[in-house]
Each structure stands twice: as structure tokens, then as C-alpha cells.
Amino acid sequence: MNNEQKVEALLFVAGAEGISVEELSNFTGYAKPAILTMLDNLEKNYEVNSKTALKLIQTGGTYKLVTKPELASILEKYFDRNSRSGLSPAALEILSIVAYRQPITRIEIDQIRGVQSGTTLQNLVLRNLVKVVGRLEEPGRPKTYGTTDEFLDYFGLEDIKDLPKLEKVGEDSELDDSDLFLQEFESKMNLNNKEK
């Protein structure tokens, strides 16, 4: 594995949030000027390689991998299909965690679920059910997420306060946080659907 592959792998897993030169330097141990050179090389490689669907962009202080604009029509078909289809169990689980714990970071969601949530969270942002509501004042300035008005419309809620109150869970409970969020969330959504 070469140095640029390490940087590329970090860009990939950073997803839509992107990653800063400082973070790339911290994770890889390479100096910032070396990181900038690698990013420049990657950007040029993506530009000249007609067989890749990706390109590297910089927005603000972060770098991210995105799809090339000429692929927009095929991606619109994909996301249009997904927007009409139901939500996966993972998407419902993430939505319920965001709804009850907002504002919340992706890392906090991952910790509650015990698995990586980046791709599903990104799809929820694209579907306008979740949005970035701010950034934490800590290293890396991670984004915080919250629900949208579209989320309320999608589930027939007038206000986020209409979600059911979570029961207190004792230490001896078999339910973990993510199970509890999802159970309560689904119970509320089933109730709403029966009333329609």
C-alpha cells in the first residue's frame, strides 16, 4: 500500500463530511506539505482517468471524494427510486437516534449502534430527512445532525415533541440505546399510520 492509497482510503471513509489536511496528517503521520502534494496528485489522477466516476474537491477546509457531474442523471434515477421506497431498518434506527438525541455527531450515532453509519446517514441527508445543524467546538469540528421539517412530514408529526417519551432503562435491561430508540420510534409510527 502506498502513501496516496492511505490518504484516498481516509477520503473515502470520510464520505460527505470530508476530511481536513490536519486530520489527514494526524491519521497518517505525514507532514501537511506531503499531504497537500498527495491530494494534488490524487486530484490530477482523477481528472485524467476517464474510467473513474470520482473526482476530488475541496470545500472550505475539507477535501472529499464526489461523483463526476456527468453522472448526475443516473444518480438522480437512483435517488429518485430510493426516495419513493421505504426506509431500511438501518435508516429507521439512525433516524430514531437522531430524533431523540439531536444534535448528535456521526461518531455518537456509530457508538450507539455499534456499527458505522456514514453511508446511511449520508442517504438520509440526501433524502432531506436529516440535516447538518452545526459543528462541535472540538478538534476536527465534527458536524452535528438533526431532523428536518421533511422528517416531520414523512412521519405525519407536527412537532418533534410529538415523539413518544423514552422510558428510563435500568442497567439490567436487555435493550440497548439503539433498540430502545427504534422500538419507541416504530411504535409511534405504527400508531400514526393506523390513525390515517
Curated annotation (Swiss-Prot):
This is Segregation and condensation protein B. NCBIfam families: SMC-Scp complex subunit ScpB. Belongs to the ScpB family. Participates in chromosomal partition during cell division. May act via the formation of a condensin-like complex containing Smc and ScpA that pull DNA away from mid-cell into both cell halves. It comes from the Bacteria. One of its GO terms (cellular component) is cytoplasm. GO terms for biological process: cell division; chromosome separation; DNA replication. Its main location: cytoplasm. It is found in: Cytoplasm. The gene is scpB. The keyword Membrane does not apply. Pfam families: SMC_ScpB. Keywords: Cell cycle, Cell division, Chromosome partition, Cytoplasm. The keyword Cytoplasm applies. Homodimer. Homodimerization may be required to stabilize the binding of ScpA to the Smc head domains. Component of a cohesin-like complex composed of ScpA, ScpB and the Smc homodimer, in which ScpA and ScpB bind to the head domain of Smc. The presence of the three proteins is required for the association of the complex with DNA. InterPro entries: ScpB_csome_segregation (IPR005234), WH-like_DNA-bd_sf (IPR036388), WH_DNA-bd_sf (IPR036390).
